[in-house]
Amino acid sequence: MAETILIETKTAGGNCRSYLMAGASYLGILCFVPLLMSRDDEYVYFHAKQGLVLWMWSILAMFALHLPGIGKWLFGFSSMGVLMLSVVGLVSVALRRTWRLPLISHVVALI
């Protein structure tokens, strides 16, 4: 009963613009560029939603710094998680695939 991580999209076209926009989705606040400019491309929109959730996670992690004692640890682990998932997302774009990222796929489905 393992959930599939690879999703087949109908419009994973071969143009370079789609891949550049999908790659920009995982670069922090740049996730808004493909989110707003490529809503009609299913491939780019999928990656933009995942990038948006990663960006929101990194913003929320900054608030953990205000917690006494455990805040720095929580921020460090969250930042490492966001960095690793962003790299996995960039690799999936480089391989022209659509992978659901493990920790955030349920939140992305709600968007």
UniProtKB/Swiss-Prot annotation:
Sequence ranges on the Lumenal membrane side: 39-50, 94-111
GO cellular component: magnetosome membrane
Keyword Transmembrane helix: yes
Transmembrane spans: 18-38, 51-71, 73-93
Post-translational modification: Subject to cleavage or degradation; identified by N-terminal sequencing of proteins that are about 103, 92 and 15 kDa in size.
Residues in the Cytoplasmic compartment per record: 1-17, 72
Presence of the UniProt keyword Transmembrane helix in the record: yes
Location relative to the cell: Magnetosome membrane
Induction description: Part of the probable 4 gene mamGFDC operon.
Phenotype caused by lack of the gene: Normal magnetic response, no change in magnetosome size or number. A double mamF-mmsF deletion has a normal magnetic response, slightly smaller, fewer magnetosomes. Deletion of any 2 genes encoded in this operon (mamC, mamD, mamF and mamG) decreases crystal size regardless of the protein combination. Deletion of the mamGFDC operon leads to smaller magnetite crystals in irregularly spaced chains, but no other phenotype.
Membrane-topology annotation of the record: Multi-pass membrane protein
Keywords annotated in UniProt: Biomineralization, Magnetosome, Membrane, Transmembrane, Transmembrane helix
Other remarks on this protein: This bacteria makes up to 60 cubo-octahedral magnetosomes of about 45 nm in diameter which contain membrane-bound crystals of magnetite (Fe(3)O(4)).
General function of this protein: Plays a role in regulating magnetite crystal size; partially redundant function with MmsF.
Protein family according to the UniProt entry: Belongs to the magnetosome MamF/MmsF protein family.
Quaternary assembly: May form homooligomers.
Protein's UniProt name: Magnetosome protein MamF
